Design a protein with these regions (language model features):
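Short helix/turn-capping signatures at newly exposed starts of structured segments
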Residues: 1-93, 133-134
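Sterically constrained small-residue positions within well-ordered secondary structures
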Residues: 50, 62-64, 99, 108, ...
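Short, surface-exposed coil-to-beta transition loops
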Residues: 52-55, 68-70, 101-103, 110-114
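Short Gly/Thr-rich strand-loop-strand
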Residues: 86-109
C-alpha cells in the first residue's frame, strides 16, 4: 500500500500542463488535444501506475489555462483493496442513495491536488482514480 500511496503522491505533484512528465509517470502516450467547448482533452488507451495497469486515461484541461486540469483513469483487474485510510485527511464517502449506480469513494487533498479513489460496490476494490489540479 505504501508504494501505491507514493505513486499517487508523485503523480499528483506533476504539473498537468507537462504532458511529457505525465506520459513518463503513467508509461503511456496521451494523444493530441481535441477541443470540447472550453476544454481540451487528451486520451490514452492504457498505461501503468507503479504495478497497476491503468486504462481509459483522460486528461481534461481548460483551453486557456492547461494547468487547471483533471486526470482520470480506470484500474484494470486485478486491482487493489483499499480497506483503510491512506492519507490522514482522507474521507470515505458512501454511495449516494438518490443516485442509482452510485459507488463509494475516498477523497483527499494530496499536495495541491484533489484525489478521488473510486471503489467498486464491495466498498474496497479500487476501480478508478481522479486527480484534479486547480
Amino acid at each position: 500500500m505504501e508504494r501505491f500511496k507514493n505513486d499517487i503522491e508523485r503523480l499528483s505533484s506533476v504539473r498537468f500542463d507537462d504532458v511529457d512528465a505525465l506520459n513518463e509517470q503513467l508509461h503511456t502516450h496521451l494523444g493530441e488535444p481535441t477541443r470540447q467547448d472550453v476544454m481540451d482533452e487528451r486520451i490514452a488507451g492504457h498505461g501503468m501506475l507503479g504495478d497497476l495497469e491503468v486504462r481509459n486515461i483522460r486528461l481534461r484541461s481548460a483551453a486557456d489555462d492547461p494547468a487547471l486540469a483533471n486526470l482520470i483513469f480506470e484500474i484494470a483487474p486485478p486491482s487493489i483493496a483499499l480497506k483503510e485510510i491512506i492519507w490522514e485527511n482522507s474521507t470515505k464517502h458512501p454511495p449516494r442513495p438518490d443516485a442509482p449506480g452510485s459507488r463509494p469513494y475516498w477523497s483527499a487533498q494530496v499536495n495541491d491536488a484533489k484525489v478521488v479513489l473510486g471503489l467498486d460496490s464491495d466498498n474496497v476494490t479500487l476501480t478508478y482514480i481522479s486527480i484534479s489540479q486547480r
